[in-house]
């Protein structure tokens, strides 16, 4: 049985948009107003502030990790099922993509998804991270690296995740991330997608 409070807390944690928070801290423009308009680390990097981009990446990944780890630590005391943990994982990503604190205008979810996967299955997260790194360094296109790693996630989950509900959650997470990258997919097909760090 899903625990509604646990899912709600996870959604609220996911709703913390570190791209906006970090940018505001450094006196930068709201990342939703320049570049791709996406409040994520890649777009923050376009501002030229590498430290802000790194902090955004770490913050977005950490919130996914913390939301799911918190639920796993409290799983027995709260009587949370494995399916409830899967729902918590999804809620963190949904919060990032449609954050209640920022007008439901969120990011594409790559870093948060990685944090969620790290909490569910470190091996799955490691596979995805390695694929992202290879693709990013090889092609210098963030979205291509993200899409490749995203597609690999459910396949890796089949081998490394212990619960079927978590595998299904990983598949849904991958589909959500792919959905949020639909404009990037279109640009890739047209050969118009920008390189990492390139200003628009």
Swiss-Prot record:
Localization in the cell: Cell inner membrane
Any GO BP annotation: phospholipid biosynthetic process
SMART domains referenced in this protein's UniProt entry, alphabetically: G3P_acyltransf
Name of the top EC class for this enzyme: transferase
Pfam families: G3P_acyltransf (PF02660)
Any one Gene Ontology molecular-function term assigned to this protein's record: acyl-phosphate glycerol-3-phosphate acyltransferase activity
Presence of the UniProt keyword Protein transport in the record: no
GO CC terms of this entry: plasma membrane
Keyword presence, Transferase: yes
Known pathway: Lipid metabolism; phospholipid metabolism
TM regions (residue ranges): 2-22, 51-71, 84-104, 114-134, 159-179
Enzyme Commission (EC) number: 2.3.1.275
Catalytic reaction equation(s): an acyl phosphate + sn-glycerol 3-phosphate = a 1-acyl-sn-glycero-3-phosphate + phosphate
InterPro entries (UniProt xref): G3P_acylTferase_PlsY
Record key words, sorted: Cell inner membrane, Cell membrane, Lipid biosynthesis, Lipid metabolism, Membrane, Phospholipid biosynthesis, Phospholipid metabolism, Transferase, Transmembrane, Transmembrane helix
Membrane topology: Multi-pass membrane protein
UniProt cross-references to NCBIfam families, sorted A to Z: glycerol-3-phosphate 1-O-acyltransferase PlsY
Quaternary data: Probably interacts with PlsX.
UniProt similarity note: Belongs to the PlsY family.
Name listed for the protein in its UniProt record: Glycerol-3-phosphate acyltransferase
Taxonomic placement: Bacteria, Pseudomonadati, Pseudomonadota, Betaproteobacteria, Neisseriales
